[in-house]
Amino acid sequence: MEQQEIKERIYQFLTKLKKADGLEYDTELFKSKYITSLFALQIVMFLEKEFGIKLGRKDITEQNFHTINAMAELVQLRLGAGGGKNG
């Protein structure tokens, strides 16, 4: 799966749940207070279901979730490692 498609799916999910004025793929989601820790849990569940991947404790870090770009890289890594329905 192309990283651009992954980014678009994540962006669509985020904007469905919360108004997205100025949201870009490189927006610092925690620093901008766009997401909170509770919202992050919803994102983890979305990523696992949407892309058919399993995220472990080591994957769930602020570094992996600080931007849409970072989340897309994590998803692509998991898909490439055979950790998803498209990998």
Q: Language-model segments: which ranges?
A:
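Thiotemplate assembly-line natural product biosynthesis machinery
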Residues: 1-22, 73-87
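Short alpha-helical elements of helix-turn-helix
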Residues: 8, 38-41
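Flexible coil/turn residues that form the inter-helical turn or adjacent wing/linker of helix-turn-helix
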Residues: 22, 53, 64
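Glycine-rich loop motifs involved in handling phospho/adenylate chemistry
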Residues: 25-36, 59-67
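Beta-hairpin "wing" of winged helix-turn-helix
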Residues: 54-58
